[in-house]
Amino acid sequence: NPVDGVEITYKLASGGSATLAITHPNGDVIREISVPGGSGVHRVNWDLRHSTGSGSETWAAWDNPELARPIGNRGAWVTPGVYTATVSANGSSNSTHFTVRGDPEMPQITQDMYDARERFMLEAQALTAEIQAYMRENGMGGGGGRGFGRGGGPPIDTPQGKLTAAMRAVGGAYSSLNGGQVRGGTLYPPTTTHRQQFHLAKSLFDEVRGGMDR
């Protein structure tokens, strides 16, 4: 299978820890990944995605003959632009620049559309993390995943029920764009329905916070 994303090759004179940092065109570092730090030549890849926001990352080669790429939880696709990959090890750093392009088979998607999609995905991810943190702080669970699950839950007229519904709403919007498991996502920007799901989640969250903070 071809490499997932862009391949990065580096050589280290001596062993130690090493980190790969990816810098967005806007100057923000969007991924920091622990990579092999032994002496010699190494080749790793970045999957052209943002972090999942779930903690530290360690790179590992993907060699499943039945699957072209991982099917677990993954961050949102980045928007087209010029990115910087920096490998830091043994007190020194080396950077290289590369261009991420839009899908050539979808020329109808403009840069503004890619940018709108990226903004929405990051806002959805941030809202989910905020709701999860609030639930944990107030003894309502909130750990694990993005609330993408379906099924039963606490009554909707309770704070926990409203937050669970909020997680499902924003999680549904995120996953329908990003895909998951073996289901592909889409590069198109969010629809009116996606934005309505996001605003519903935010309204429910604001309602719970307002009631509990009084």
Task: For each feature predicted by the language model, list its residue ranges.
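Mature extracytoplasmic or organellar-lumen-exposed domains after removal of signal/transit peptides
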Residues: 98, 129-214
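Short acidic/polar inter-strand loop motif in beta-rich domains
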Residues: 52-56, 88-96
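Contiguous beta-strand segments within globular domains
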Residues: 1-19, 23, 43-45, 110-129
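Surface-exposed coil/turn segments at beta-strand junctions on protein surfaces, enriched
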Residues: 1, 13, 37-39, 76-80
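Glycine-centered tight-turn motifs at strand-turn-strand junctions
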Residues: 29-76
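Charged, amphipathic alpha-helical linkers/stalks
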Residues: 97, 102-145
